C-alpha cells in the first residue's frame, strides 16, 4: 500500500470518529427545534387572543337554516347571546326555579344498580326543610291518581310533602304526563335540591353502568334513523336525545376535574372536541333540541304568564314574574325567530296516532331509565332534563287532544322548573359551542396533525443523521 493510500485511510478513520457525535448532536438539535416549535405554537394560541387567527371566531362553520326548524344558526347564536342566555341565567337563580323536587333513590326497573361512581362530587347536597320556600310545603290541588311504579327499597331522602299551592299556582294541578315515567307522586321519598349548589359537572361516573344507560337509550328506545328516512316523526326523538346527550357532555367537559389531588377544575377541551365538536351532527342536534324546547316555552306563553311564582319572598317573586315576561315577550325573539319549530307538520296521516303512541312509549322508557343511573348527581340532572324534555313534548303534542283528556294545558310546578332549567342548560351549551368551537377545533386539529406528522419528521431526522455517516 502506497503512502497516499495510507494517508487517505487514516483521514477516513478520523472522519468516522467525529461523524457519530456530530450525527447525535444533529438529532438532538433537530428534535429540540421541532419540540420548541410545537410548544410555542400551543402557547401562542392561548396567550395571544388578538392574533389574526382569532378572526375565525366571527365566522363559524354552522350556517343556514337549522334542519327541521324555522331559524338559522346565525340568528339563533345572536339571539341566544344577546337576549335569551342572560335572561335564563338570571331566571334559574331565583328561588322559584332554584329548588327542584326529586326522588333521588329508586330501584332500577330494568336491572340491578351496580354502578356507583367513586368521587364525592357524585353526591347531592339536599336542602334542609327550613331552606326551601314555605309556599312549597302547602297542600297540593287534588288531581288524577297515579299508577306509576314505586320504589320498593329506595331510602327516603327528605320526607317532603307534595307542594302545589292552590292560591299561588292557579291551574297547576296534579296531572299525568303521557310522555314521562312520573315517579314524583310518592311524597314520602321526595327531596328538595338546590340546583345552584349541585351544578351539572364531571362526577367520575364512568364504566359499564354509564355506558349501559346510553346504550339502552340508543339501541332499544331511540335508534338512529336511516340516511334515507323521510318521515320526520322518526327523526324527532333521536335528534332530541342526541341533542340532550351532546349538551350534557358539553357541561361535563366545561367543568371537569383536571387534577383530583389538587381539586383543580377547568375545561377539558380534548373531551369537548372528542365528544361533541368533531361531530357536526351532534352540534346540529343540540341546536335542534334547543329550538324545540324554546318553541314549547313560547307556545305555553299564556299559561306561564298568568301563573304566580310564589315563594314567600315578594321582591324575588316579582323579579321572577318580570323575567318570565321578558323571556316570553322578547321583541327580538318575536321578530327574529317567532316560531322556532313547527310542530303542526307532525303526526299527520292515518298512521299518525299509532306512531305517536309508539314514540311516547319509547320516551317513557327513557324517562324510567334515569332511575338506573348509578350516580346521585347524574341521576338528579338526568331526571330534571328528561322531565323538562317530556314537558316540552307534552306542550307541543298533547294539548287539545285525547292524550291528557282536556283542551287546556295543565302543568305541575316541577314540570315548569324542569322545563326552564333545561332551556337554560341548552342555551349555555349553544353559547359555548358558538364561543369556543373555532378555537378548540383549530387547536385540536393542529395537535392531531402534529402527532400524525411525528413519524415522518423523525424519519427525516434519522435520514439526515445517517447521511453524515
Swiss-Prot record:
GO terms for cellular component: endoplasmic reticulum; endoplasmic reticulum membrane. Its cofactor is FAD. Glycans are attached at residue 365. It is found in: Endoplasmic reticulum membrane. It is an enzyme of class 1 (oxidoreductase). FAD binds at residues 201, 203, 214, 242, 245, 275, 282. Its EC number is 1.8.4.-. It is a peripheral membrane protein. Essential oxidoreductase that oxidizes proteins in the endoplasmic reticulum to produce disulfide bonds. Acts by oxidizing directly PDI isomerase through a direct disulfide exchange. Does not act as a direct oxidant of folding substrate, but relies on PDI to transfer oxidizing equivalent. Does not oxidize all PDI related proteins, suggesting that it can discriminate between PDI and related proteins. Its reoxidation probably involves electron transfer to molecular oxygen via FAD. Acts independently of glutathione. This is Endoplasmic reticulum oxidoreductin-1. The gene is AERO1.
Amino acid at each position: 500500500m502506497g503512502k497516499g493510500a495510507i494517508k487517505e485511510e487514516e483521514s477516513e478513520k478520523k472522519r468516522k470518529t467525529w461523524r457519530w457525535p456530530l450525527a447525535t448532536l444533529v438529532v438532538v438539535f433537530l428534535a429540540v427545534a421541532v419540540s420548541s416549535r410545537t410548544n410555542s405554537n400551543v402557547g401562542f394560541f392561548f396567550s395571544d387572543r388578538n392574533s389574526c387567527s382569532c378572526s375565525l371566531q366571527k365566522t363559524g362553520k354552522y350556517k343556514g337554516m337549522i334542519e327541521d326548524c324555522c331559524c338559522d344558526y346565525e340568528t339563533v347564536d345572536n339571539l341566544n347571546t344577546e337576549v335569551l342566555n342572560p335572561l335564563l341565567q338570571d331566571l334559574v337563580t331565583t328561588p322559584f326555579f332554584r329548588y327542584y323536587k326529586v326522588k333521588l333513590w329508586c330501584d332500577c326497573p330494568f336491572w340491578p344498580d351496580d354502578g356507583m361512581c367513586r368521587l364525592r362530587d357524585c353526591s347531592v347536597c339536599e336542602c334542609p326543610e327550613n331552606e326551601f320556600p314555605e309556599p312549597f310545603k302547602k297542600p297540593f290541588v287534588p288531581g288524577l291518581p297515579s299508577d306509576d311504579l314505586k320504589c320498593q327499597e329506595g331510602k327516603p331522602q327528605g320526607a317532603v310533602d307534595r307542594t302545589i299551592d292552590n292560591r299561588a299556582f292557579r291551574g297547576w294541578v296534579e296531572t299525568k304526563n303521557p310522555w314521562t315515567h312520573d315517579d314524583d307522586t310518592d311524597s314520602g321519598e321526595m327531596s328538595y335540591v338546590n340546583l345552584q349548589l349541585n351544578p351539572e359537572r364531571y362526577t367520575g361516573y364512568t364504566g359499564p353502568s354509564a355506558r349501559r344507560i346510553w346504550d339502552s337509550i340508543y339501541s332499544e328506545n331511540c335508534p338512529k334513523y336511516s340516511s334515507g328516512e323521510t318521515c320526520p316523526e322518526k327523526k324527532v326523538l333521536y335528534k332530541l336525545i342526541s341533542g340532550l346527550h351532546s349538551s350534557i357532555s358539553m357541561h361535563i367537559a366545561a367543568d371537569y376535574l383536571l387534577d383530583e389531588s389538587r381539586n383543580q377544575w377547568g375545561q377539558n377541551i380534548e373531551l369537548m372536541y372528542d365528544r361533541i365538536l368533531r361531530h357536526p351532527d351532534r352540534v346540529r342536534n343540540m341546536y335542534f333540541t334547543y329550538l324545540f324546547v324554546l318553541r314549547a316555552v313560547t307556545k305555553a306563553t299564556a299559561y306561564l304568564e298568568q301563573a304566580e311564582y310564589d315563594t314567600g319572598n315578594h321582591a324575588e317573586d316579582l323579579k321572577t314574574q318580570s323575567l318570565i315576561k321578558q323571556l316570553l315577550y322578547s321583541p327580538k325573539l318575536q321578530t327574529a325567530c317567532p316560531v322556532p319549530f313547527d310542530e303542526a307538520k307532525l303526526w299527520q296521516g292515518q298512521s299518525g296516532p299509532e306512531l305517536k303512541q309508539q314514540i311516547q312509549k319509547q320516551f317513557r322508557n327513557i324517562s324510567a331509565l334515569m332511575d338506573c343511573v348509578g350516580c346521585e348527581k347524574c341521576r338528579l340532572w338526568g331526571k330534571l332534563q328528561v322531565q323538562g324534555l317530556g314537558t316540552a313534548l307534552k306542550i307541543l303534542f298533547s294539548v287539545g287532544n285525547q292524550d291528557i283528556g282536556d283542551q287546556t294545558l295543565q302543568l305541575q310546578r316541577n314540570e315548569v322548573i324542569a322545563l326552564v332549567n333545561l332551556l337554560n342548560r341548552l342555551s349555555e351549551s349553544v353559547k359555548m359551542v358558538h364561543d369556543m368551537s373555532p378555537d378548540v377545533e383549530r387547536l385540536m386539529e393542529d395537535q392531531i396533525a402534529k402527532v400524525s406528522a411525528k413519524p415522518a419528521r423523525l424519519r427525516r431526522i434519522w435520514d439526515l443523521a445517517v447521511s453524515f455517516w
